[in-house]
């Protein structure tokens, strides 16, 4: 394996206690990338979740965890892995001491599964989920497929391991080791190493890969147990437990020997795993039936073993006598750098040769005159002490919470309370009088007349009256079709800022979904579309008359729901944006039915009405009913988002295999819609008789033949229409990002979830 980002450390400068013979230690060339994001994660936890007390995580005076356990990590990925690993350490401490550890694991699992499958994490207004959304967003922006693989692996880790049996009293070594192989995070390590090194294990080799790596996973678990024994023992005592879920305790009890003797038994087991795994790696290197990436993964794990050992021997997390180095203490006291150092000049490349410009880091603290971001000051024991931060606003306009006496005074604008179940066991004693907050805000707040599926309001529950079944049927059908729920996700993301009370938020989702589904019913009928989400369109099943009647009925039903807000302004917003939807659709239909090609400006005016109207509707309702003391106009952002959303849809309709599967090949051309690529083609080739005649034939036949659609698509490529659309998407994406940044500064809160939604749309 080629080593590009790490160097071998002089063995005379570190200790191994004789437990890693034959495996050198390698250290990443830019460990400060990890340090910055590790401290940032701690600050985010203080701000979003609660105080850390005497917590210590992945930093060490000489060696940081990720820098020596994944030394060949691609530089642009080291920061986010350091951030994610710090969350893992925090989560580990939570499940050690929490009364409901499995609930926290279930929550972690659900969040990562959602991020991997939909790009959305529900309930992102809660602290932990906001942190997870940030991780997912950063990873997706680097490499979507590697990120999805890692998020799925971490979800599996949360499901099977992650301390789920910390309270189990294991009786035998074999029983415990079987559990520990899962709990050490087979899937967690797999996710870290593969994402960090840009590795893609072939699906057919995955089972074999893990089987070959089992010995390494066992080593990692045993090493962790050996050096974390004292910490876990003290935690068990503090929690009034008479046992410790650690190999040392299990050996002592099963063999009836002393602690010192049990540790020696553990050391011998560790030595054996080193010998065995070195042989496995050497044997695998010689095989020609194993992929290069599987070999790279196993060799990467080899250095994880030496790194994990050396870090464990002197890290502050396991050893109270160990402190931090000067740079770390300086950053803890005076603030971390505003931006991480540039990696490899002006850009970095991932394993696939994709270049990424260095990103400006998230501003999670106040800026001083030295381009620093203030984090809570920390003493040599890792405990926060009084800081001079006074919740001031930094250069980016983000307001941050003051820190005092080891606790985070949570920003009142967030209206979030400290969850003492998520606080280190030693700090819990100091905060036992503080009330916790709900794990999922908005849970257990069902509004009358709605059905919730995975937290998203999907349909109105009809009364038992038989007379309504007929008029309800078309709506129920369209509501039952699979949906990505982008609007629900966007509402959840905006609520990070707006803090709309749960009952009102559910009402906004219900109204939005009603209007969205009715618009789909009418659009498919008016456009002559026979497919919706890969299924038959509503009007092809229920007929045009019933579909129109049901759609109109549910517009009235939506208005009834708006009345429940109890104020006139909500009704005004509803009527204004509903009118916009109809005006936008009228322009689209007029251009299509009369074969009139609009200008680009006219097209975007139509989009702001037809697509942007629904986004503005829920955005304006959320602003009106926001409990946040800061008020901001979301209209500009939502208009830009609507433009981006529709332009992306235009492009995907012509180029995406998934769209072809769901709606048919180039369906927009069948319908005669003037999408942005077609508008560009018409205006860039006004004298092209092929284009004009094909479009005339489409009007005559009310559809375009597959051959005609293919011809139009080829002309779009030749005339640069698809490239023009891609360029437009880049510009619109930048404008949406700028709007998000402006709103983050206005509200004083980073919106990781909204950025994740935008990134998923860009990558899809």
From Swiss-Prot:
Chain intervals with Polar residues compositional bias: 381-391
Transferase among keywords: yes
Catalysed reaction, written as an equation: isopentenyl diphosphate + (2E,6E)-farnesyl diphosphate = (2E,6E,10E)-geranylgeranyl diphosphate + diphosphate; (2E,6E,10E)-geranylgeranyl diphosphate = talarodiene + diphosphate
GO molecular function, one term: lyase activity
Organism taxonomic ancestry: Eukaryota, Fungi, Dikarya, Ascomycota, Pezizomycotina
Residues given in the record as dimethylallyl diphosphate binding sites: 532, 610-611, 646, 653, 663, 673
Pathway stated in the Swiss-Prot or TrEMBL entry: Secondary metabolite biosynthesis; terpenoid biosynthesis
Region Prenyltransferase: start-end pairs: 325-761
A Pfam family recorded for this sequence: Terpene_syn_C_2
Source organism per UniProt: Aspergillus flavipes
Record remark on domains: The conserved DDXXD motifs as well as the NSE/DTE motif are important for the catalytic activity, presumably through binding to Mg(2+).
EC number: 4.2.3.-, 2.5.1.29
The entry's keywords: Isoprene biosynthesis, Lyase, Magnesium, Metal-binding, Multifunctional enzyme, Transferase
PROSITE patterns with a match to the protein in the record: POLYPRENYL_SYNTHASE_1 (PS00723)
Protein name per its UniProtKB record: Bifunctional type I diterpene synthase tndC
Motif extent (NSE/DTE): 224-232
Annotated Mg(2+) 3 binding sites: 523, 527
Sites where the protein binds Mg(2+) 1: 92, 96
Family: In the N-terminal section; belongs to the terpene synthase family. In the C-terminal section; belongs to the FPP/GGPP synthase family.
InterPro entries given in the database record: Isoprenoid_synthase_dom_sf, Polyprenyl_synt, Polyprenyl_synt_CS
Residues that bind Mg(2+) 4: 523, 527
Region (Terpene cyclase): 1-324
Cystine crosslinks: none
């Amino acid at each position: 394996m080629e080593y590009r980002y790490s160097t071998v450390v002089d063995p005379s400068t570190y200790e191994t206690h004789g437990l890693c013979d034959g495996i050198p230690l390698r250290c990443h060339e830019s460990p400060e990338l990890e340090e910055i994001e590790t401290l940032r994660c701690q600050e985010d936890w203080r701000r979003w979740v609660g105080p850390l007390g005497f917590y210590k995580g992945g930093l060490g005076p000489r060696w940081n965890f990720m820098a020596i356990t994944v030394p060949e990590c691609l530089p642009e990925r080291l920061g986010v892995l350091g951030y994610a690993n710090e969350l893992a350490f925090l989560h580990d401490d939570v499940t050690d001491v929490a009364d409901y550890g499995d609930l926290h694991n279930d929550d972690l699992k659900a969040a990562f599964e959602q991020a991997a499958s939909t790009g959305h994490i529900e309930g992102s207004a809660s602290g932990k989920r906001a942190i997870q959304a940030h991780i997912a967003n950063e990873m997706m922006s680097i490499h979507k497929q590697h990120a999805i693989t890692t998020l799925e692996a971490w979800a599996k880790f949360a499901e099977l391991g992650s301390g789920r049996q910390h309270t189990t009293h294991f009786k035998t070594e074999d029983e415990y080791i079987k559990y520990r192989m899962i709990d050490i995070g087979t899937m967690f390590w797999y996710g870290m190493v593969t994402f960090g090194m840009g590795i893609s294990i072939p699906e057919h080799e995955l089972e074999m890969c893990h089987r070959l790596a089992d010995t390494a996973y066992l080593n990692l678990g045993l090493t962790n147990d050996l050096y974390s024994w004292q910490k876990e023992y003290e935690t068990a005592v503090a929690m009034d437990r008479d046992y410790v879920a650690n190999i040392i305790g299990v050996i002592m009890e099963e063999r009836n020997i002393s602690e010192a003797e049990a540790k020696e038994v553990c050391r011998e087991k560790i030595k054996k795993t080193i010998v065995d795994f070195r042989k496995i790696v050497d044997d695998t290197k010689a095989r020609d039936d194993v992929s290069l990436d599987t070999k790279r993964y196993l060799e990467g794990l080899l250095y994880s073993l030496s790194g994990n050992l050396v870090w464990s021997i002197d890290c502050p997390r396991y050893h109270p006598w160990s402190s931090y180095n000067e740079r770390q203490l300086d950053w803890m006291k005076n603030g971390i750098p505003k931006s991480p150092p540039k990696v490899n000049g002006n850009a970095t490349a991932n394993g696939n040769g994709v270049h990424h410009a260095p990103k400006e880091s998230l501003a999670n603290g106040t800026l001083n005159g030295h381009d620093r971001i203030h984090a809570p000051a920390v003493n040599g024991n890792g405990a926060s002490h009084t800081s001079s931060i006074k919740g001031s606003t930094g250069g980016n306009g983000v307001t941050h919470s003051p820190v005092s006496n080891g606790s985070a005074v949570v920003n009142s604008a967030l209206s979030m309370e400290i969850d003492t179940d998520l606080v280190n066991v030693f700090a819990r004693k100091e905060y036992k009088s503080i009330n916790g907050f709900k794990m999922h805000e908005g849970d257990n707040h069902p509004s009358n007349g709605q059905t919730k599926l995975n937290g998203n309001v999907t349909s109105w529950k009809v009364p038992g009256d038989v007379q309504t079944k007929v008029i309800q049927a078309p709506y129920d059908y369209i509501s039952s079709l699979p949906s990505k729920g982008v609007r629900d996700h966007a509402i959840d993301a905006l609520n990070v800022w707006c803090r709309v009370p749960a009952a009102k938020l559910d009402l906004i989702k219900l109204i939005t979904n009603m209007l969205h589904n009715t618009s789909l019913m009418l659009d498919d009928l008016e456009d002559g579309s026979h497919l919706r989400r890969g299924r038959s369109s509503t009007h092809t099943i229920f007929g045009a008359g019933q579909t129109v009647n049901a759609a109109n009925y549910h517009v009235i039903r939506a208005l009834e729901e708006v009345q429940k807000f109890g104020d006139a302004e909500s009704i005004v917003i509803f009527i204004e944006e509903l009118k916009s939807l109809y005006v936008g659709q009228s322009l689209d239909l007029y251009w299509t039915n009369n074969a009139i090609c609009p200008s680009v400006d006219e097209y975007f005016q139509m989009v702001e009405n037809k697509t942007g109207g629904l986004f503005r509707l829920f955005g304006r309702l959320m602003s009106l009913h926001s409990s946040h003391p800061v008020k901001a106009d979301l209209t500009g952002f939502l208009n830009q988002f609507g433009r981006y959303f529709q332009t992306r849809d235009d492009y995907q309709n012509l180029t995406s295999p998934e769209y072809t599967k769901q709606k048919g090949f180039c369906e927009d051309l069948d319908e005669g819609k003037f999408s942005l690529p077609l508008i560009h083609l018409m205006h860039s080739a006004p004298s092209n008789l092929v284009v004009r005649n094909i479009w005339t034939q489409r009007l005559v036949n009310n559809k375009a033949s597959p051959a005609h659609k293919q011809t139009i698509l080829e002309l779009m490529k030749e005339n640069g229409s698809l490239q023009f659309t891609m360029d437009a998407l880049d510009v619109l994406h930048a404008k949406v990002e700028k709007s998000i940044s402006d709103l983050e500064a206005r509200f004083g809160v980073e919106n990781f979830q909204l950025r994740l939604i935008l990134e998923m749309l860009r990558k899809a």
